[in-house]
């Protein structure tokens, strides 16, 4: 996911962004969907706009639509928050962006492993996710993009395989997807990712989502019986993530205590 967003920020920025242009993200983004755009903002002198949320950890859709101007060039928003569990109305958000002729990047790192996602139904221009989030190897992931957009973007890195012809005067680049795959690919990682996707597909994403919802509801209700418990993120549409604090106990201390009891938390 991280490398995919960096690739898109770099290539899209090189092709389409100029000083004064705008990129929209949300307040609930992972650092991987903030820092690449901040780096781009420094290089290209563009503006980063942020969609706010309400007390239930839901994005304010009215405020989102107000952020668009004729300088808005791309929207990049997380599908499911890795901290709050909020499932954002991505399909609706994409439609709004397209009404303004603006492409949309979906960070699906937290949704692909936990629910059925259809890029064509969403009409996403770009979608990214990580292999290790879906029980595959680390260091490998997926960048999906509509062919019309990928053809417009310059290569992110140079090297073998992403070229057709090289001379000291000029280089011509390979067709998709090889244009964005410089050097020797991670054959082992991609094979492992394919097996992981086969594994969750065989179980059924609907079954996974239903079971995780049941566990999340049970855990939430049990946690609420603990004195001083504070749960963050109570959106109407919520994934299987629960963030909490207990009284004034520092989260590091709580994590250490739970670890000693054999309970894993993040």
Q: Where are each of the predicted segments found?
A:
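Pyridoxal 5′-phosphate
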Residues: 1-266
């Amino acid at each position: 996911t991280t490398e995919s967003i960096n690739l898109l920020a770099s290539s899209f920025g090189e092709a389409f962004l100029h000083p004064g242009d705008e990129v929209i993200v949300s307040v609930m983004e992972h650092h991987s969907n903030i820092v690449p755009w901040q780096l781009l903002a420094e290089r290209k002198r563009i503006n980063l706009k942020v969609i706010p949320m309400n007390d239930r950890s839901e994005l304010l859709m009215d405020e989102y639509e107000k952020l668009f101007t004729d300088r808005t060039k791309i929207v990049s928003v997380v599908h499911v928050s890795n901290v709050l569990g909020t499932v954002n109305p991505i399909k609706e958000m994409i439609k709004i962006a397209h009404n303004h002729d603006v492409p949309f990047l979906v960070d699906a790192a937290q949704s692909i492993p936990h629910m059925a996602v259809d890029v064509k139904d969403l009409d996403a221009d770009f979608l990214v996710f990580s292999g290790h989030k879906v029980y595959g190897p680390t260091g490998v992931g997926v960048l999906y993009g509509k062919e019309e957009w990928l053809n417009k973007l310059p290569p992110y890195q140079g090297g073998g395989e992403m070229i057709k012809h090289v001379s000291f005067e000029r280089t011509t680049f390979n067709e998709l997807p090889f244009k964005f795959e410089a050097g020797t690919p991670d054959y082992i990682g991609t094979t492992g990712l394919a097996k992981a996707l086969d594994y969750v597909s065989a179980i059924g994403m609907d079954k996974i989502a239903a079971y995780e919802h049941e566990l999340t509801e049970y855990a939430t209700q049990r946690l609420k019986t603990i004195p001083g418990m504070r749960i963050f993120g109570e959106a109407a549409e919520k994934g299987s993530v629960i963030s909490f604090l207990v009284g004034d106990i520092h989260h590091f201390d709580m994590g250490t205590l739970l670890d000693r009891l054999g309970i894993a938390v993040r």
